[in-house]
């Protein structure tokens, strides 16, 4: 019954769209991570390509700005030998009032095989997935506050790379959880993979009330939240999504919740520090931590290419 209800899976329980980590079986999440591990060596080859998506057309539709996600999706698709089309939304018919579904219908008429979609409206990738032909696939590159599944997966890949097993890990997610689609995807992924304890850390104004129901421990002080942690995932303040005075100031936030080398000593000595980017140095994290030996922020970006290669190759290989 789970497979039939989940719009990401076909009747055989195979992944045909990646819309959210929520509801994905553990074996599919693990399969994506295992597949990504096989792709990490591609970047070391003289010819950085494999032929898995040769002849396929991948359309990147980013209705919100992006640097890391858009670029790594483009690199990933090209390394899979796909033809990549980056739609310039600012110059597209979307600015002339064309609806999202009409945009998709017209691009589908151009023989699109896979849409990578980032949109400010939660649920936009789901809507698209409901209206594309059976051979067309949709990957969510971030929708509103809802989900950012490939970021969640690359975060899990990073954690597994450095920590191997989730069963004994304590992971803290710190910062603007309220507006973070990454936090939600990370929480779903961590709980699916059997992480021992997930902590959500931030001021009451930036932690949604439903967090406890997601199986996490809520902490409102950084000291409590990161004490004896194995992994710390820092989140930026998403000022562009804030409509009210949720914080006194960025300086006050850094004083209370900013991760400094001194505060990092509360975590385990071999703890790793992660961040989905973009980083705001001196707001949620000190430069000395970003550039320090416990930071794995740049490896996250590198692993993101392999993870996105894995996702696209898997969904494109399955039919609805």
UniProtKB/Swiss-Prot annotation:
<keyword id="KW-0808">Transferase</keyword>
<feature type="binding site">
    <location>
        <position position="277"/>
    </location>
    <ligand>
        <name>carbamoyl phosphate</name>
    </ligand>
</feature>
<feature type="binding site">
    <location>
        <position position="69"/>
    </location>
    <ligand>
        <name>carbamoyl phosphate</name>
    </ligand>
</feature>
<dbReference type="Pfam" id="PF00185">
    <property type="entry name" value="OTCace"/>
</dbReference>
<dbReference type="GO" id="GO:0006207">
    <property type="term" value="P:'de novo' pyrimidine nucleobase biosynthetic process"/>
</dbReference>
<dbReference type="InterPro" id="IPR036901">
    <property type="entry name" value="Asp/Orn_carbamoylTrfase_sf"/>
</dbReference>
<feature type="binding site">
    <location>
        <position position="68"/>
    </location>
    <ligand>
        <name>carbamoyl phosphate</name>
    </ligand>
</feature>
<feature type="binding site">
    <location>
        <position position="96"/>
    </location>
    <ligand>
        <name>L-aspartate</name>
    </ligand>
</feature>
<feature type="binding site">
    <location>
        <position position="151"/>
    </location>
    <ligand>
        <name>carbamoyl phosphate</name>
    </ligand>
</feature>
<feature type="binding site">
    <location>
        <position position="236"/>
    </location>
    <ligand>
        <name>L-aspartate</name>
    </ligand>
</feature>
<comment type="similarity">
    <text>Belongs to the aspartate/ornithine carbamoyltransferase superfamily. ATCase family.</text>
</comment>
<comment type="function">
    <text>Catalyzes the condensation of carbamoyl phosphate and aspartate to form carbamoyl aspartate and inorganic phosphate, the committed step in the de novo pyrimidine nucleotide biosynthesis pathway.</text>
</comment>
<comment type="pathway">
    <text>Pyrimidine metabolism; UMP biosynthesis via de novo pathway; (S)-dihydroorotate from bicarbonate: step 2/3.</text>
</comment>
<dbReference type="InterPro" id="IPR002082">
    <property type="entry name" value="Asp_carbamoyltransf"/>
</dbReference>
<dbReference type="InterPro" id="IPR006131">
    <property type="entry name" value="Asp_carbamoyltransf_Asp/Orn-bd"/>
</dbReference>
<comment type="subunit">
    <text>Heterododecamer (2C3:3R2) of six catalytic PyrB chains organized as two trimers (C3), and six regulatory PyrI chains organized as three dimers (R2).</text>
</comment>
<dbReference type="InterPro" id="IPR006130">
    <property type="entry name" value="Asp/Orn_carbamoylTrfase"/>
</dbReference>
<dbReference type="Pfam" id="PF02729">
    <property type="entry name" value="OTCace_N"/>
</dbReference>
<dbReference type="GO" id="GO:0044205">
    <property type="term" value="P:'de novo' UMP biosynthetic process"/>
</dbReference>
<dbReference type="GO" id="GO:0016597">
    <property type="term" value="F:amino acid binding"/>
</dbReference>
<feature type="binding site">
    <location>
        <position position="118"/>
    </location>
    <ligand>
        <name>carbamoyl phosphate</name>
    </ligand>
</feature>
<dbReference type="GO" id="GO:0004070">
    <property type="term" value="F:aspartate carbamoyltransferase activity"/>
</dbReference>
<dbReference type="InterPro" id="IPR006132">
    <property type="entry name" value="Asp/Orn_carbamoyltranf_P-bd"/>
</dbReference>
<protein>
    <recommendedName>
        <fullName>Aspartate carbamoyltransferase catalytic subunit</fullName>
        <ecNumber>2.1.3.2</ecNumber>
    </recommendedName>
</protein>
<keyword id="KW-0665">Pyrimidine biosynthesis</keyword>
<feature type="binding site">
    <location>
        <position position="148"/>
    </location>
    <ligand>
        <name>carbamoyl phosphate</name>
    </ligand>
</feature>
<dbReference type="GO" id="GO:0005829">
    <property type="term" value="C:cytosol"/>
</dbReference>
<dbReference type="GO" id="GO:0006520">
    <property type="term" value="P:amino acid metabolic process"/>
</dbReference>
<feature type="binding site">
    <location>
        <position position="181"/>
    </location>
    <ligand>
        <name>L-aspartate</name>
    </ligand>
</feature>
<feature type="binding site">
    <location>
        <position position="278"/>
    </location>
    <ligand>
        <name>carbamoyl phosphate</name>
    </ligand>
</feature>
